[in-house]
Curated annotation (Swiss-Prot):
Pfam families: G3P_acyltransf. PANTHER family: GLYCEROL-3-PHOSPHATE ACYLTRANSFERASE-RELATED, INNER MEMBRANE PROTEIN YGIH. Residues 192-201 have a biased composition (Basic and acidic residues). This is Glycerol-3-phosphate acyltransferase. It comes from Maricaulis maris (strain MCS10).
Length: 216
C-alpha cells in the first residue's frame, strides 16, 4: 500500500470512527431526547451534563476521548506512526464536524486529549496537567482547555517530536476557532467560573460551556 493510500485509509477510518456521536446516542438511549435541542446544541460531555446526568456525561467524556485514541492506536499499530497521527487528527475532525449531524458536533477537547495520549503520551499528560493546573488557579473551564491545547505543540517540540507538534498545532487552531464565543466572553470578563452561577448573558449562548466540566 502506497503512502497516499495509507494516509487516505487512516483519514477515512479516523473520521468515521470519530464521528460516532456518543453523547447523542447515550442520551437518546437514556430517554433524554435529542441533546442537540438543549444548551449549546453540542454533542460533547459538557452539554450532556446539562441533562443532569453526571454518569452519562462522564461516560461520554471517556468514549469521546477513547474513540480518538483507539483510531490513532489501531492505524498506528497496523500502518505506522504517520497513519496513527492522521487517524487521530481526523477522528478529532469527525467529532467536531460529523457528517451524520450536519457537521455540527462537539468542541474537540476530549478527542484531542485521547489522540495526544496515544500518539505521544508525554504530550497527553502535559495537556491533562495543564488543564488541571489552570482550572485550579483560575476556576474557568474554557480558559483551562485553551491553555491545555496551546501547551501541546510546545510540549511536543520540547520532547523532540515535530510531527506531533505540527498535528497538535493544527488541532489547537481548530479548538480555538470552536471556542471563539468563549474567548469573546473571556475578553469581556463574562465567562462563568467552575462552581459559580452563570449570568443570564452567558447561560443562554448558543455554544457556551458549562462551568463545571472541561469543554469537550
Amino acid at each position: 500500500m502506497t503512502s497516499l493510500l495509507i494516509a487516505l485509509a487512516a483519514a477515512a477510518g479516523g473520521y468515521l470512527f470519530g464521528s460516532i456521536p456518543f453523547g447523542l446516542v447515550l442520551t437518546r438511549m437514556a430517554g433524554l431526547g435529542d441533546i442537540r435541542a438543549i444548551g449549546s446544541g453540542n454533542i460533547g460531555a459538557t452539554n450532556v451534563l446539562r441533562t443532569g446526568r453526571k454518569d452519562l456525561a462522564a461516560l461520554t467524556l471517556i468514549l469521546d476521548a477513547g474513540k480518538a485514541g483507539i483510531a490513532a492506536a489501531v492505524f498506528g499499530y497496523f500502518l505506522g506512526t504517520t497513519a496513527g497521527l492522521v487517524a487521530g487528527a481526523f477522528a478529532f475532525a469527525g467529532h467536531c464536524f460529523p457528517v451524520w449531524l450536519g457537521f455540527k458536533g462537539g468542541k474537540g477537547v476530549a478527542t484531542f486529549v485521547g489522540t495526544m495520549l496515544v500518539v505521544f503520551w508525554p504530550v497527553g499528560l502535559t495537556v491533562i496537567a495543564t488543564w488541571l493546573a489552570m482550572a485550579a488557579i483560575f476556576r474557568i473551564s474554557s480558559l483551562a482547555a485553551l491553555a491545555a491545547a496551546l501547551a501541546a505543540p510546545f510540549a511536543a517540540l520540547a520532547w523532540g517530536r515535530p510531527d506531533v507538534a505540527i498535528m497538535a498545532g493544527l488541532l489547537t487552531v481548530l479548538i480555538y476557532w470552536l471556542h471563539r464565543a468563549n474567548i469573546s466572553r473571556l475578553l469581556k470578563g463574562e465567562e462563568p467560573r467552575i462552581g459559580g452561577k452563570k449570568s443570564e448573558t452567558s447561560a443562554d449562548v448558543s455554544d457556551g460551556d458549562d462551568p463545571d466540566t472541561p469543554a469537550t
